[in-house]
Amino acid sequence: GIIKLLSEMVEIKSISSDKNHRDDVDASAQFVQNLFAGLGLNTQVIKVAGGMPAVVAHTEIDPSKKTVLLYAHHDVQPVGDLSMWDTEPFNPVLKEGRLYGRGSGDNKAGVVVHYNVVKKLLEDLPVNIRIFVEGEEEIGSPTMSDFIEQNREALEADVIVIADSANVKIGVPTITTTLRGLVDGFIEVDQPMRPVHSGMGGGIVPDAFMVLSKIIASFHDDKGNLQ
């Protein structure tokens, strides 16, 4: 059943940030591939240069139907301080209807959700299905842009469903319609080519720190909204 399947996934120590667990991340990807291959989907494990293994899969594509991409990730965070755990992180335990173990929620549950939905609807799917289960989300998906660039066709879809969010509260099914994004970059501010005394610099002619602080302060309005 669902609990048994999720438990088997949780037992795999797919810690993407730990080089000592590279084999476990590979094993986790293989597990996910086998899952969807068992449903008859076309599946692949793909790893771009410097990246962790991701699984892509798809049903037979009917051009007359819309295509839905189901996203999740199979890697997990390190366990941290073991003294803070009441159970062994990779020995899943079912207590009062909840499964405890590293990745039981984030995000191996998401993989199992996608698997069971496809399994239930497979004989009469109203849409084309593509699957993307990455293996480096917990380290910031450093090769995501390269992966997308190299596998655009495998990820092409009209809608994306991400099984990696949270419920409003336990037991209440929840659909999240927006998620925070992430943008990084560099801001360079020129300053005098030689040191100046703090009592002499700044003021009418602002120094680099003043300019940079104003730029950063302009990112949000008084209510915290991005501008």
Indicate where each model-derived feature is located.
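Acidic/His- and Gly-rich active-site-bordering loop/insert found
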Residues: 1-102, 121-126
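Acidic-enriched catalytic cores of C-N bond-cleaving enzymes acting on peptides and small amides
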Residues: 198-227
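Predominant activation on well-ordered alpha-helical scaffold segments within soluble catalytic domains
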Residues: 7, 33, 112-115, 119, ...
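Acidic/histidine-rich catalytic neighborhood of metal-dependent amide-processing enzymes
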Residues: 103-178
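Short small-residue beta-strand/loop micro-motif enriched in glycine and branched aliphatics
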Residues: 100-101, 193-199
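Flexible glycine/proline-rich, aromatic-decorated loop/lid segments
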Residues: 174-190
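Generic secondary-structure signature for well-ordered alpha-helical cores
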Residues: 11, 37, 123, 152-153, ...
